[in-house]
């Protein structure tokens, strides 16, 4: 009897543990219903590019492939693969957004194409017309003529939360209607050379061929367009990026209405604020976008912005990282008034600006070595010289001093290099060698001091600290 009671007690404990584990477990989502509802409106996109020898040249990514950095690659298949005339090859994905046949995809999927073909899940193959494309956002709008087209519901990427489940459907490596799932890893990611898109980062498996396909939330609404991956192998490594559908809709509507996208323009070059820069500009913590240069005649110039200003808010949106500012400005309509909060020498102020239209291109500047050097006899241990008139014109600056030689000391520790141009020190303009020595002689010791330099045509602030002698 005692033995039975003993085994009964053990059995009850074991059953209790099993029930407890089941109660604590979280059921994984079932994607089957979502996939069945949405797949018919996902399409496979093929392109043909005609070449001089009457053969066909097919692209996974367009003619700009060689210019795209290895670090963030668009999705390409076998580049520059030749086939017979008019032979098509799968290049990417897209999805239907309206009953009258409008389709969203990536610009790099259709860039350089002479003909575009769309294949639906019901095996219909249609010729698509390119309505418009936008390289800066990597988006393109196509249109097909057909009846009874399935359409996807569009969600709001602004309501997407980190940790939320998301699903991708596309044609990786030509395997049509492949379904992968994961979670939102981060929002508002800024990628190199992609200033105007706050990307959604996910761990959804994305590979060549998924490009242009939809990213769904659990309600089956499109919240993003799969666009890029981080890879060192050419394939998926757990980091994928999607264009928010809110951004895509704005671009699509402009392309449909006018065939082009107008973006707001402020006319500043900005950089990140680190701990040392925050201290030198009297900020309580690293935040905002530090203005390194104000372009002459730009909206920022007309509004009175200055190098050294830190933009901490734009139209009520707090700027934590400098990368958050460009896409906010870009989505502001040209001619619209915008309000900013700016910290200047430790004091916060309100600045109103009328946003301009982003120019088609943005030319850089270059420096030309020349001129006479001044002896190294200053607290920074630098040898500097005046800029020539040709250098000033080339760099579009009123003045500054060129660093001829750097000796061990505070400037070397701060990272100043030969051929750097010093424009200001501790928020004091430096236009000549004489001004340079005058400013340096009055620098306080033991404090973090901002120094504005121009290096290879690019302005940037660095932090200098003079130690007690």
From Swiss-Prot:
It catalyses: Acts on substrates that are at least partially unfolded. The cleavage site P1 residue is normally between a pair of hydrophobic residues, such as Val-|-Val. Substrate binds at residues 209-211, 266-270. GO terms for molecular function: serine-type endopeptidase activity. It is found in: Periplasm. Pfam families: PDZ_2, Trypsin_2. This is Probable periplasmic serine endoprotease DegP-like. GO terms for biological process: proteolysis. Residues 255-346, 352-457 form the PDZ domain. The gene is mucD. InterPro entries: PDZ (IPR001478), PDZ_sf (IPR036034), Pept_S1C_Do (IPR011782), Peptidase_S1_PA (IPR009003), Peptidase_S1C (IPR001940). Its main location: periplasm. Its EC number is 3.4.21.107. Belongs to the peptidase S1C family. The keyword Signal applies. CDD domains: cpPDZ1_DegP-like. Might be efficient in the degradation of transiently denatured and unfolded proteins which accumulate in the periplasm following stress conditions. SMART domains: PDZ. GO terms for cellular component: periplasmic space. It is an enzyme of class 3 (hydrolase).
